[in-house]
Swiss-Prot record:
A Rab11 effector protein involved in the endosomal recycling process. Also involved in controlling membrane trafficking along the phagocytic pathway and in phagocytosis. Interaction with RAB14 may function in the process of neurite formation. Residues 1-129 form the C2 domain. It is found in: Recycling endosome; Cytoplasmic vesicle. It comes from Rattus norvegicus. The FIP-RBD is involved in the interaction with Rab proteins. One of its GO terms (biological process) is regulated exocytosis. The keyword Transport applies. The keyword Phosphoprotein applies. Homooligomer. Interacts with RAB11A, RAB11B, RAB25, RAB4A and RAB14. This is Rab11 family-interacting protein 1. InterPro entries: C2_dom, C2_domain_sf, FIP-RBD_C_sf, FIP_classI, Rab-bd_FIP-RBD.
Length: 648
């Protein structure tokens, strides 16, 4: 924003520059003073009493280039046009030729009135100025010089000028400070008011007897009503505001003993007055003694309560001290320590012994059970018998009831005890089958079954008797089946007594029994046609023992472990291995949850940084707008900064 835009505002709205920056760029058409039509030219810049000189442009052919700048402080340009102000606001440019011997030779000079240049409503003026001769000499062609002049306002120097004004009016707070300082220098009432905080003392209860003497009261009043101890309102405000409420002062007759004694000698007081004074002194001393004890004993008491700092042999700790009717005993921390020592964690109480014994007994049982199987032999054998009986009962339920074990293979595969049991079973089965055949022959009435009684004729049997006999036969067959089942159940139990207790051998025996059953299939003992009414044994749904369920479980578990191992191997192969020098090595060892937490933290920090960057950008934008409005000349400075001219 230039002053040309604000030309219509009038001189009242013009701003006053504090500095001027002069940049000497170049010159042309200079007279040659050196050999070969050259010159070693330099320029001198002067405003008021300050001078600056540029560097020497050696052997220039009448067109030296300097591009050097100098800054001068200006007086107020808008003041009235007096002679000193006009001389201080004139810019003088002098071009000289440097001579090796003697004085430098004059090439030309130019003068610029800065007030007129500022009134031209432009902050920056760049133009060519013609060089002239010295005043009083004939003008010649001396060439031109190009100068860039820029007016500036430094706010710091302007504020310094404002602060240095002597006729500036003081604010009321400054006047108040001056008054307070003057009072402190002249009077000593502030110190007196700080020493004596209040003029209305609180009288102690022992001073009631002193109220009879009116003369003494008047003397005390006159003592405190002296003008040297009175407060002025200013000193009172200074002493009361920064401090808290002062404590009350207890006045005793003993404090004014010497003053009253002197006055008593001067006035020749009676003997009654001296007796009163002696009574007052004794009462004051008696009054101060309990106060001293009250102030001293609580300190010791407080020290004694802090963790038992005193030893047990201390006389004060042993004695029962009575302070204001309260007995203080020093052995309370010891009682607390005794209570702590009698806690169940440290004391060997019977409950603690019982708990420890229980824990140790359970640990011993848990430790001995796998190591010493022989100690609990009775219990383990009973459990094994029950388990084996349940297994064999399941086997017998799954096998058919009419199984004969009479083959040689079965005898070879079994132990001698099992062989005897098997032979007994075959004999019993033969007897039962013969009984069945005889009963069936009786029921059906066929003659070919009864071979022994061929010649004896059978008596005729009615249909009712046949039905009754069939029912009886069915009942007998059911009873025989019930008796036969527990016998077969007991056979493997007896065989297991002699066999080993290894579960794998049990599985082998069961497999052998299954193979024996498959080899020796049961044959019908007698081809006798049966009616549905006389069928004794129902066919079982599972004539063959079911397959062992442990085998597929083992295979499934082995397959699962194999798949897990293969998956782990694949994952290890797919995982990329990082070297310790790689920065990714620090993150390769982290778990999934740790990586998620790390990402969230990084995201939070990035958001905070983005917020800070946004705030800085907004601040810079606002600052740039402010600079453009107030001092746009900063933005007009060219990128190439000129050299500084040397001060002369």
């Amino acid at each position: 924003m230039s002053l040309a835009a604000s030309a219509g505002r009038g001189p009242g709205t013009m701003w006053s520059p504090t500095h001027v920056q002069v940049t000497v760029l170049q010159a042309r058409g200079l007279r040659a003073k050196g050999p070969g039509g050259t010159s070693d030219a330099y320029a001198v810049i002067q405003v008021g009493k300050e001078k600056y000189a540029t560097s020497v442009s050696e052997r220039s052919l009448g067109a030296p280039v300097w591009r050097e700048e100098a800054t001068f402080e200006l007086p107020p340009l808008l003041s009235s046009g007096t002679a000193p102000a006009a001389a201080a606001a004139t810019l003088q440019l002098t071009v000289l030729h440097r001579a090796l011997l003697g004085l430098d030779k004059f090439l030309g000079r130019a003068e610029v009135d800065l007030r007129e240049l500022h009134r031209d409503q432009s902050r920056r003026k760049k133009q060519w100025y013609t060089l002239k001769s010295k005043p009083g000499k004939k003008d010649k062609e001396r060439g031109e010089i190009e100068v860039d002049i820029q007016f500036m306002r430094n706010n710091m120097t302007a504020s310094m000028f404002d602060l240095s004004m002597k006729d500036k009016s003081r604010n009321p707070f400054g006047k108040l400070k001056d008054k307070i300082k003057g009072k402190n220098k002249d009077n000593t009432s502030d110190t007196a008011s700080a020493i004596v905080p209040s003029t209305t003392p609180s009288v102690d209860s022992d001073d009631e007897s002193f109220s009879k003497d009116k003369k003494k009261k008047s003397k005390i009043k006159t003592l405190f009503s002296k003008p040297s101890l009175q407060k002025t309102p200013l000193s009172q405000s200074m002493s009361v505001l920064p401090t808290s409420k002062p404590d009350k002062v207890l006045l005793r007759p003993g404090d004014f003993q010497s003053r009253w004694g002197d006055e008593g000698d001067n006035e020749d007081e009676s003997s009654s007055a001296s007796e009163v004074m002696s009574q007052k002194r004794t009462s004051s001393t008696d009054h101060t003694q309990p106060n001293q004890s009250n102030f001293s004993l609580p300190k010791k008491e407080g020290l004694s309560f802090l963790g038992g700092l005193r030893s047990k042999n201390d006389s004060l700790s042993r004695s029962n001290v009575c302070i204001n009717g309260n007995h203080v005993y020093m052995e309370q921390p010891e009682a607390k320590s005794e209570i702590r020592e009698s806690s169940p964690s440290n004391s060997p109480s019977p409950q603690g012994f019982r708990k420890r014994h229980l824990f140790s007994s359970t640990e011993n049982l848990a430790a001995r059970s796998p190591k010493e199987p022989g100690e609990g032999g009775g219990m383990s054998s009973d459990r094994r018998l029950s388990d084996s009986s349940t297994k064999d009962s399941m086997k017998s339920m799954s096998l058919p009831s009419y199984r004969p074990l009479t083959t040689a293979d079965s005898r070879e595969g079994l132990s001698p005890a099992n062989m005897e049991v098997a032979t007994k079973e075959t004999k019993d089965s033969k007897k039962q089958e013969s009984k069945k055949s005889s009963l069936l022959s009786l029921v059906t009435g066929k003659k070919d079954v009864a071979k022994g009684s061929e010649g004896e004729p059978l008596p005729p049997v009615s249909e009712k008797e046949k039905g009754r006999k069939g029912v009886l036969v069915e009942a007998q067959l059911r009873e025989e089946d019930l008796v036969r089942r527990p016998e077969k159940d007991a056979v493997p139990v007896a065989s297991q007594w002699g066999s080993s207790q290894n579960p794998f051998e049990d599985a082998q025996i069961s497999d052998l029994e299954a193979s024996v059953e498959s080899k020796c299939e049961p044959k019908p003992p007698v081809p006798v046609p049966r009616t549905p009414q006389t069928r004794a044994v129902k066919p079982r749904p599972h004539p063959v023992k079911p397959m062992n369920t442990t085998a597929p479980k083992i295979t499934n578990s082995s397959l699962g472990t194999a798949t897990i191992i293969s998956e782990n191997l694949i994952n290890e192969a797919l995982m990329k291995k990082y070297q310790p020098s790689d920065p990714a090595f620090a993150y390769a060892q982290l778990t999934h949850d740790e990586l998620i937490q790390l990402v969230l933290k990084q995201k939070e920090t990035i958001s905070k940084k983005e917020f800070q960057v946004r705030e800085l950008e907004d601040y810079i934008d606002n600052l740039l707008v402010r600079v453009m409005e107030e001092t746009p000349n900063i933005l007009r400075v060219p990128a190439q900064t000129g050299k500084k001219a040397g001060k002369m």
